[in-house]
Amino acid sequence: CPVAEEHFLVPAHEARGTQGEDQRPAGAASELELQEEGPKLGEERPKPEAGALEERGPRPVVSIVRPRHGPKRKPAK
């Protein structure tokens, strides 16, 4: 087990550097792709977006419901 932990820690530091470098160009590329797709979606359906904004305005804000993290535990006696 200690060998596996040491083996895991060393590549983790190396992987963090490579992941950070890989994520930045990938993130920039994905942002460019999203920007290219964004106008296309906007051109295809500008009316539903405008309608959605109009509908959201007068509606009251709904309270945020937090996701549950499993069933409630009974107190130990």
Swiss-Prot record:
Segments of skewed composition (Basic residues): 66-77
- Which InterPro entries does the entry link to? DUF4691
Q: Where is the composition biased (Basic and acidic residues)?
A: 1-24, 37-58
Query: Which Pfam family, an example, fits this chain?
Result: DUF4691
Which residues does the annotated region (Disordered) include?
Answer: 1-77
Q: List the PANTHER family hit by this protein, alphabetically.
A: CHROMOSOME 16 OPEN READING FRAME 86
Q: What is the protein name given in its UniProt record?
A: Uncharacterized protein C16orf86 homolog
